[in-house]
UniProtKB/Swiss-Prot annotation:
Keywords linked to the UniProt accession: Ribonucleoprotein, Ribosomal protein
General function of this protein: Involved in the binding of tRNA to the ribosomes.
Disulfide bond positions: none
Family membership: Belongs to the universal ribosomal protein uS10 family.
HAMAP family: Ribosomal_uS10
Domain of life: Bacteria
Organism taxonomic ancestry: Bacteria, Pseudomonadati, Pseudomonadota, Gammaproteobacteria, Thiotrichales
Subunit structure: Part of the 30S ribosomal subunit.
PANTHER family the record matches: 30S RIBOSOMAL PROTEIN S10 FAMILY MEMBER
GO CC, any one term: ribonucleoprotein complex
UniProt-listed InterPro entries: Ribosomal_uS10, Ribosomal_uS10_dom, Ribosomal_uS10_dom_sf
GO molecular function, one term: structural constituent of ribosome
Name of protein: Small ribosomal subunit protein uS10
Native source organism of the sequence: Francisella tularensis subsp. tularensis (strain SCHU S4 / Schu 4)
NCBIfam families (UniProt xref): PRK00596.1, rpsJ_bact
Amino acid sequence: MAINNQRIRIRLKAFDHKLIDISTQEIVDTAKKTGAQVKGPIPLPVRKERFTILISPHVNKKARDQYEIRTHKRLIDIVEPTDKTVDALMKLDLASGVDVQISLS
């Protein structure tokens, strides 16, 4: 029994781009094996957070360090998912460094 006219949208976030690419490929392979149509993965813009920290405690305002955190994002749409697709995605074990958000529409 297929879920008619529905779409599963999966958003992935991670700091490591290799980790998010591996997780994305696992999701796409799982969805295709169960007979669902997959659109994506679509790379979304990378969010860059920069922090500037003073090195010395009192003087030397010019002495600073800069750090950056990059958050990589991907979007996957699974069109016309079957019951097997939903079950397989629920059982899928992804890496711990990847944040997964799933929405049905």
